[in-house]
Each structure stands twice: as C-alpha cells, then as structure tokens.
Amino acid sequence: MKYDYIIVGAGSAGAILATRLTEKPDTSVLLIEAGPDYPDIESLPDEVRIGLSTGADIITKDHNWQFWGNPSPKAAPMPVPRGRVIGGSSSINGQVFLRGMPEDYDMWNDMGNNEWSYQKVLPYFRKLETDLDYSGDFHGSDGPIIARRHKRENWIESQVAFYDACKDSGFPDGPDQNHPDVTGVGPTPFNNPNGIRWSTNLGYLTMSRHRLNLTIKANCITQKIIFDGTSACGLEVESQGEKFTVYGNQIILSAGAVASPQLLMLSGIGPADQLTSLGINVVKDNPGVGANLRDHPIMSALWAVKEGHIQDPEAPRTQVSARYTAAGSEIRNDMKLSFNSFAIADSRVEDRLSESTQSHHADINTPIGVKISVSLQLAESVGHLRLVSSDVNEQPELNFNYYSTEFDLERGREGMRKAINLGESKHFSN
C-alpha cells in the first residue's frame, strides 16, 4: 500500500498532523512512533499519566530517548529529555502551556514566512485549547488540549511566598500569562487537568485513532528515508528486529529537534563533508541541517528548607511564574522566573532509571528543598548537532553552546541576582 502521507514521530506535532489530515476520509495516513502506544488513559503508566510531580517522568528509561548533550565546552554533560512514546515529549514534559510573545511570531513573518504572524497563528492557538479559566479573543473554549491554572486558594505556602516576594520587588500582577500584553507574576498555565498530563495522544489521537484512514504503528524505528532521485518517496523501518519498507506520496518528519535532523543526515541530506566522512551517500549537500540548535537554558538558585518543614513530594512543583524583560533588552519578556519545590519521593524512582542515568544522578535522594529557576526565553547563543556514526541507534553529538554571547551572559547573571534576592525575601522566613 502507498499512503498519501507518512508521518515520522507521533509527538507534539505528529499526532496533531495525523488527526487533522485524516479529517478527510479519502486521505490515508501512516503515523510511525519509535516508542510504545497507549491507546487510552487507563493504559497509561503513572509516569506518563500523572502530571504533577512523579519525579520519574523525564529521566526514566522507558519513555525517554536518554539523550545527553553538552551545555558548553566547560560544563558537564546534561540529560536532554526527548519523548519516546506515543504523544512524544508531550507525554513526559512539565506541561507548562505557555505561548510565545506576539513579537516572536511577527519576527518570523518579517523574515518572509507570512503564514506565521501572530494574527495568523492566534486562531490556531484558540482552536487547539479549552481554557478552563479564560475566554474571549485570545483563548479557546472547545479545543482538544485542556489548559488550567492553580487557583490562588490552592497554592502551597512556598508558592504564595514567591508571588508575594515578586510583588514586593516590583513585578506587576500577570494573572493570564498567555495574554499578548502580559508581563509580571501570576499562575502558570498548565495542560494537566486534575493532575493528568494532557498530551497530544489524549487530546488528539483519542478522537482520531478509530479512523479507517489512519494507521498507527508504534515501536518502529525509522532508519532511513528512501529517495526517488531527490524526492522522498518512502522509509526504511525496523520493528522487533525485522526491516520493512513503506511508501508514501509525502513524507513528513515530525521526530523533534534531535531525531529529525539526525534522520535527514543518515539519509544523505546535510553537510557533505560530515556525511562522506561517515560513509553516507550524499543526496543533497545542505550545511544547515544540524546547525542553529537552540533551546531555553535554565539556571537555578537552590535553598534547603528548615528542619521540620515538610513538603509533599506529590504536590505540584510549580504553580507560579514571572515573565519580565531583562535590563537593556529590546526583546519583551525575554526572561522567566519559576518557583519550584523539589523532592525525590522514594526509591522506586531510582529503580526506573537506566545505569547510564544513575551514573549521572549519583545523589538520587536529593534533600527536599526549593529553587528559583531562571530561564532565558530567546537566547542569542546557538549550537549544533553532529552525527558520530551512520548507525541510527547511536545518538548524535549535541553541543548547545549556552551563554556563549555576552548579551546572554548579562541576562543570565541579572536573572540569577533577581532569583537570589527573591529567595532572601521576608516572605520565605517560614
């Protein structure tokens, strides 16, 4: 069979694409996922289903690619969580449902991609969500992804202290962090109603997986793109030790910021010198593949809590956050502060870790404490992804080059000073 579309990766984007494309009954779609499939909420394991603070969701071996990356040339390697499960990273993430600023999308428009202006993407933000707290021009009321905020009366003591400390230091009140004009401190929007991580699996595939024109294949590793000349026409896929070939009119890579460029390069699209050095036949010399690797670097200031102060490890770890513009920056809300409680609940978390992960988390029984995280939302620094082998099972080298520009360093230092000052506030005296 030749499909109309083959989508690689059933994650945050792939599951949505498959659902939307199969709205037309005469359009056939094959959705391929490397990890396991959980067809309903009852079959989800706890670390995927529970979205409050399982502690294991982003570091366990069962649903994570277990990538490691280099933050900077001098820093120790860090885990790079990427979902290997139906729903992709939306099935293991922290569920922060925070939009970019309008200027972010308008910048893409100004670069020539006029379908990505804020005014053009806003209808789709509204279409995808059911916001339980806000309505009006900027929010949806009947979309597949459920968004909510923790009510003030349900904030834990330390989250209230963070909010009050921010207000005392001059942050304005920002109750709707997804409003286009917002800045300041307020409740963080999450896609976890009743503590359930509402992934694209639950939100989108639940309403489409019954369709006869949608085929979902889990536990399948895509090894290579097949080309007819320079046009993609199929894929080589491995499942349970057997190799298969599938064909489609259009091949869509939706495997994430690591696996998509990796697959392109393994298939012969990328920097020619890098590919030939690994014995990969060059289909298209494209030095941009693997370049311009970007992320939101986060630093944290940590405090131990007073003896006798009890924090529930099953309570929400984040409820409140603040968006602000760094001093001297022309990028509005380029910084974010989040208050987090942290705790490892019990030894069961350690039991679910791979040996590799345990070696990088030797002190797995982290003392209960709190931290204020400083996130650089639009960094200047860029990194790169580089193949180390022609074997799809060997992860590429990930070099992020965090804080490699003076402007990023200035904003990061200022953010850490703000975090430390907030943590020393009288509101945390208890």
For the regions a protein language model found, what residue spans apply to each?
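N-terminal redox-cofactor-binding region of secreted/periplasmic oxidoreductases
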Residues: 1-430
